[in-house]
Every structure is written in C-alpha cells, then in structure tokens.
Swiss-Prot record:
Cytoplasmic topological segments: 1-741, 787-862
Matching Gene3D superfamilies: P-loop containing nucleotide triphosphate hydrolases
Region: Disordered, residue numbers: 524-543, 821-862
Pfam families: RHD3_GTPase (PF05879), Sey1_3HB (PF20428)
Entry's EC annotation: 3.6.5.-
UniProt-recorded Gene Ontology molecular function terms: GTP binding; GTPase activity
Organism lineage string: Eukaryota, Fungi, Dikarya, Ascomycota, Pezizomycotina
Species per Swiss-Prot/TrEMBL record: Pyrenophora tritici-repentis (strain Pt-1C-BFP) (Wheat tan spot fungus)
Keywords: Coiled coil, Endoplasmic reticulum, GTP-binding, Hydrolase, Membrane, Nucleotide-binding, Transmembrane, Transmembrane helix
Name recorded for this polypeptide: Protein sey1
GB1/RHD3-type G domain boundaries: 48-298
Protein task: Cooperates with the reticulon proteins and tubule-shaping DP1 family proteins to generate and maintain the structure of the tubular endoplasmic reticulum network. Has GTPase activity, which is required for its function in ER organization.
Lumenal side: 763-765
Coiled-coil regions, chain positions: 473-499
Domain of life of the native organism: Eukaryota
Amino acid sequence: MMNAHFAGVGDNADNAAYEHGIQVIDEDKMFNGNVSTYLNIEKVIPAGFNYHLISVFGSQSTGKSTLLNHLFGTQFGVMSEQERRQTTKGIWMSKNKRESGGSSMAENILVMDVEGTDGRERGEDQDFERKSALFALATSEVLIVNIWEHQVGLYQGANMGLLKTVFEVNLQLFVKDSQSTPRSLLFFVIRDHLGTTPLKNLQNTLVQDLSKLWSTISKPAGLENSRIEDYFDFAFVALPHKILQPEKFDEAVTQLSTRFKEGYNDPRKSGLIDEATAPIFLPQYHRRIPADGFSAYAEGVWDQIVNNKDLDLPTQQELLAQFRCDEISREVQVAFDETITPLEDKQAEDARAGTHSLIPDLGPKMNAARQKVLKDFDVNASRYHKGVYKRKQAELEGKVDTRLKALFQKQLTAAHKSGIEGFTEAVSAAVKNGQKKNASYDFAQIVDSEKKKALTKFEEDATAMAIEGAAWSSHENELKIYKKELDDVSGRLRKEEMRRLATRIERWVRTRLDESIGLEFNKLGSGRGGSGAPEHGDRPPTEKDLWDRVWTIFTDTVKMAEKRFTDRASSFDASADEVEVGLWRLRRKSWGVLRAKIDEEVMEGNILLKLRENFEDKFRYDDLGVPRIWRPTDDIDGLYTKARESTITVIPLLAHFKLAKTSKPPPLDAWIGEAPASVSPADEEDLSPIGGVDDDEDKTLEDEMTILSDGKQADLLVRFKKTADGVYVEAKRGAIGGLSQIPFWLYPAMLALGWNEIVAVLRNPIYFIFLILLAVAAYVTYTLNLWGPIMRVANAASQQGLEVGKERLRAFLENSDAGRQAMAMSGSGDSNSTRRYEDVKMDRLNGDGKKSKSMEEDLDDI
C-alpha cells in the first residue's frame, strides 16, 4: 500500500498529516520545506544533537520499507503481494515508533526510506537513483544496504555499479583527508538467508567486492593510496525469510533493533563491526548538525546534488551554521535595533538641522545593547560549527560595533564641534565684555582659561560614551585632534582680534591723516604771504615743501600707530611673526589711506577751488595781505599775469609726490619693507597692490607717486585759466566802473523835486503796499538774475504785438472801400515792405524781439 498519513511535498497540512512521517523529496526531485515542522511536532528539534539518522538503500521490491517498519515501528508503504510494482517514490522520513524498544534503543531515531533502485518505472534513468543514494550517504550516520542472499557476488544485482558511482562522487566531493571527514557505517542486511552459506563467507565476499570496487574508482590527487576502510565501517547481519520463517524473522528483527543504540569507538576495531550485539551509533558517525538546522542542511545538500554542484560535507555543515547563525543574528539584532535606531535617527536629525547636540546617557545605552546582543547570540549559536560560529560572532560583533562606532564617532564629533563652538563663543563674549567695560582685557589669559574648561568638558563627555571592551572607543586620538583644533581656533581668534585691533588703529590713522593732510592741502589756497612768482623769489613754504610735510606727517602718524599696535598685541600672546605681519599690513593699509586722501584732495572740484583761492589771494591782495581796490591807474594786467603764472606752477608740483630735499619720490618700498616670511595668502587678499613694492604689478614706484597724469594736468590748466580770466574781467570792470559815477548833487535835487510824490505814496496805503510788492518783486528778480530775460521777452512781445497790429490794420483796410483806395494810392515800395514782414513768426525772432539774422538773410534772398 502507499504511504498514508504522511505529509507530502507542498502540502499545507495540519498536525494529523504528520502522524506517520513526511515525504522529504518527491519523485520530481522537489525538497519538502516542511521538514522542520515535522521535526518540531515530533519534539526532535529541542534535542539539539541528540538524534540519529538512518537511511535504507537497495533494489526496488526487496522489502526495504518492510524491514524499516518491523525494525522501527514505522508505517512506510509496502508493496502489494498481488502485484510487483514501485511503492516508495522519492525519499520518506519517519521517527522511530517501536514501542518495545524501550531504553534499549537510542532516542530520536529518524529513518529515511529511499526509493529503490533498478525499478522498471524509471528504467535506464539512473539519475534519481544516484542522487538519492548520494543524498542518503551524505546525510545519514548509518546506511542500511538491503540485499538478498542470492544477490551477494553479483555486480548489478548487488548494486555495485551504483555504489561505485556514489563512492567516486562522494570521494571527490569530500574533504581531501580522512581525519576531517565524518565516517559512515554501511550496514548490510542480508535478507532471506537460508543458512547454507555461512554469514562469514557472505561477509568476506561483500568486503572483497567493495575493496575491489574501491580500487577501480577515480580518486583525487593525494588520495590514490586511500582505502575504503578510511571512510567507511562495515556491519553485517542475516535475516531469515519473512514468508517462510515469519517467527524467526520477527525474532531476528527484534534482536537487531536492540543494536540501534549509542556506543563508543573501540580502538581495537578498525572498520568492521562483527559482534551480534555491538551498538550501531558511534560518535564518529554523527554529522554534528543540530536538529533545528537539519532541514536547512538537508535542503542545501539536495540542492547541490540536484544541480550537480560540488558537495563538500564540512562546507554544508558550515553552510547550515551560516544559515542558522545568520538567522540567530537577525533575531538578536531586533532588540538591538529597538535601542540603537532611535539614537541613530536623533543623530541624523541633528545632522540635517546642522546642530551638534549630545545624546544623554549614550554610553550606558550602547554598552547595555552591545552586551545583550552578543550574549543572546552566544547562547543560541555556540552549538553550531565552531569555526562558523566564531566567524559569525566576529561578523555580528563587527556589525554591532560598526553601528556603535558610528554613534560613538558622531557623538564624539558633536562633543568636538560643540566644544569648539562653546570655546569660540566664550572667548568672544569675554572679549566683548571687556570692550564694553572699556577695560584693557588680557586676551591671552581669556583664551587659556576657556581652553582648560573646554578640554575638561570634552574628556568628561568622551569618557561617559566609551564602550567596554571595544578598543575603538578610545578617545585619545580625538583628544589630540581636539587640542590641536583648539590651538588653531585660538590662533584664528587671536588673528581676528589682531585684525580688529589693526582695523581700529587704521581708523585712527585715517582720522589723523584726514585732518592733518587736509590742513596741509588747504594751505595751498592761501598765497598772501608769498613774495611773488617763482621767477622773482622763492616759493611760499605752503607750496615748496608740501610733499615733505605730507610725508613727515604720514610717517610720524604711522609710527605712533605702530607703537599702539605693538603695545596692545603684547596682551594677545602674539608671536613675533604675527606682530611683524600686523605691522607690515598696517604700513600698507596706511599708505592706502594716505593715497586715497591725496586723491580726494586733488579731485577736479577740490583742486580747482584751491588753485582759484591761491590765485585770488595773490591777485587781490598785496604783499602785506591787504585787499586791493582796483583803480584805472593800477597795473591789473601785470598783477594778473604774475599771479596766474605763479599759481600755474603749482600744478606740476602737485602732479608728482616728490620730496623737496631729494627731488625724488619718498622711499616707500624701503619704508614698507619686504613681506615677512610668515605672511599667508589670507593676510594679503585684502591688500591693494602698490607700485614699486609688489613685484607682480606692472606699475613702478614712479607710477605709484604720480598724482596727476599729463591729461589731467592739461585739463586742469585749461579750467584754471578760464576761472582766472573771469576774475581778471571782474577786476577790469571794477576799475572802469569808477569813471561813470552819478554826480553827488543829483541825489538832493531828485529828492527835493520828488518830495510831494514820495509823501503821497507814503500816505496812501494802496500805493504804499503796491510799492512794497514792487520792491519785493524787483529784489527777487535781481536775486535770481532774471532782469535780462524779462527785458528780452518784453522787447520780443512788443515787437510781435506791433507786427500783429499792423497785420490787423492791413486786413481791415483791405476789407473796406476807403482802405482799398488809400492802398491803391500808396507806392509800390510800401507793398514790398508789407510783403517783407507778412510772414514773420514769433519763433523767428532773436533775443531782443527782432527778426533773427537768418530770417533777414532769407528775406533779402527772396
């Protein structure tokens, strides 16, 4: 009958379906994924290593299933006595159910019934036979070879060809040394033994056949001299005929069942178990696969066999261990994730927000999570393959430590950055507080105090987050980096403070130079103390040594600024190089301030005003500084020429920054000096290039000292001459205006003759108010200089009114009889005159209200 109450491949069965066992592999070579479910139902999984696996191998219809059912009380399907056909398809498994076994049999014996070989159903297709036999040999501790007595000595009948293939493939795929390969027991059960041929003789025949078979198989390199006894032990038993001698058969089977118990390895034995009561299960036969991993192990073995992959049994053990260890690792990491993931999310959120907050109690949380996950893994995975367990333990520890290390490093980085930020803010706040109090604070002392606080805080935070037993949680290297960055930040803050100091001193220099240099240039506008033009005497001090005074004022001011800078920098604990760079920058910046001030003073409007003032002081005042009252007898032309030429010579003087003592530009390059060796690009990025000082500039020192270019000088000269000419014309008018004065006696005469009219106007309010309004209007008109335009407009309007009146009169005369007669009596000249003006428009009048010259020329042409 077929197997009943067995869970087949793909069945989604309940517990009742597993009553008698499970189909491990079906006839289509599909592995049943519910094997672990069956083992769990049979309570084999909790046994760990305390289980044993037996397989049966033999030809079809030789009673393999019957033998197993009698030995172990299983319910494997057996062949019907009315027909001889295949009964077992695929590979089936059942747990030992022999009730009479008692304590004489080992616990948790698993029995696999393998499809028989040489069946007519599969015919010449021996692929499944080879694979199922190899699977049974690879997974089982004991392989029962079921053989009839009359098959002993036969090649095909005893399945020697199939055994040869299995041995050959098994040897090629096994580990290449016998010491590391688990041994297996080939248990030959000789059926239907009549007793005519002693069991000993049958045993010798089988051993000889197997040894001969072993010598003919292909062996891997290094195993050419290996023997079959190096890999297999043999046991033999003979059973009476089941049909002809049923009582003896049952008795022999019962006696045989008592041998399926655990024994030990007797060193006196060497591959042959010939005692009738010797235990079958020896320690060296066990594959050392935990029961909870057997399903995955068997499935991996079968998968490699089916796909013709290499079959390395120790590797399969490792694969099982890898599978289970990976599974256990995933399970124990669930609780680890519950603790660590929120911490990682918090750090990620802080990173996105750009903040550097410290997570409270991070160190204790990480320590507790790490210890728990490693302990849970050790408890559940330590019974598997030691090498794999150790490797997976290291991998798990590596994964855990990778995540914890990331947390630790980010927390340490947060402590680092927050400490740096806190240090910077504390120093800046202390400096600002000192500035508010207007006190002379000690910057170096502030930095030293805040640095000690920052280091103490960092070490406390780093110690609190350390992981026990993790070498990577040391913060010594980070502490060194932190100290170095504190030093760098201190240096940067010191540089910034020195920059601010330099900026304050630069403002002081700018203020002093604005006042002093502006005063020197203002002296150019006064020429009253001079002694005449250069050709008649020396230039005034205000003009001759202008640049000498400017240079002296500049260098003295910068010298005082340098002293201020040096004295203040001493409280910053600045190095000599930093002070040197600061002074070098101060000199360059100060020169830029002076150059900007000079450019401001010589701007077109400013310098032209100063030249005019200089000219007017020389022209309108005498040598004693007394203002001149121009008379017709004065030599206005000579004084004008003298003053103008004297002022003109100031322009070339201003054009170039040259010292009067040397007639050369001041030694600006030597005064600024070479750039210090410690200067950095950041120190130079805000500095303007200086000609003659910077080698990479096209300008020379002469170009740097050029204040006015030739083009500007020429333009300035033209503008000044126009201004001077205006002053000259005004002086001429003043001198001539004195000749046409109104006689003094005329004023009393006008007052006497007009007294009555004056009194009438003053007594009449209307006239008086009207007079006041006229006076105000006249004053406003005079102030706005509108008398000229008003006169021209009035003249033009009167002329245009006259022309319009003439046109109206002419039109009237042309429309009346008397007028036409009068016009007829007039001469032709009058008509020509009429035509001459009839087309005159107001927009063709000139400023005096008369026809423009172009209009008159047009009329003449006509």
